[in-house]
């Protein structure tokens, strides 16, 4: 297979949105996304990605980090415990507002709103170029740009497996499969790894597996389900039966893939 075929594998079938449409989509999701991630019952700093950074000594106090699609700044906050020279970029200004508040005590923190491909063109500007779950990286040219602006490492994180038993119960009730979540697009990692390899680098891959208790609301579930009005009413009634004090308790079975590569062969 040639490298362009891996690019097609990496890309989803979703239609391409205009930049201004993407901004509105993520602005509208920002409050829900912030509340959902902040209330997760997990010690985020214990995630494998941060253990890799520490064990491999990828960063020091003088390192410069760029987080592409930084969202509300969860990863930046952890990186700031090692270095204060952190930059977050996102298409959503509202997401960045949450990140700015979270990182308000980090004097060197910078936040750049807009299209990262337009805003970051300087060669070897950062020690680590990082991206987690972002749709902003889907082409060979995006990966090439990451390598260009990094002087040392590039690192990406992506869900490759996700299960929620409550969603499975909804599927059983409806007698059909629900729409595939973005988090279950494991072919993305397959395409990404092969593109990086074909570009001449030597990517390492790690798997972060965990089960976490999760507390969700009816809105959390409904925002991620595509259904008819009739099905919507059935799902709402079903979820009401699961609710206790407005909360629905479940478990998430998660596997995240982490790909790390050094832009310097030696």
Protein language model features and the residues they cover:
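Short alpha-helix
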Residues: 184-200, 204-206
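Class I SAM-dependent methyltransferase SAM/SAH-binding core
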Residues: 66, 72-118
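A short, conserved alpha-helix within the catalytic core of class I
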Residues: 136-149
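Residues lining the SAM
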Residues: 131-133, 157
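Conserved Class I S-adenosyl-L-methionine
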Residues: 204-266
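Conserved class I S-adenosyl-L-methionine
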Residues: 1-59, 155-177
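A short acidic, Gly/Pro-enriched loop at the edge of an enzyme's catalytic core
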Residues: 121-128
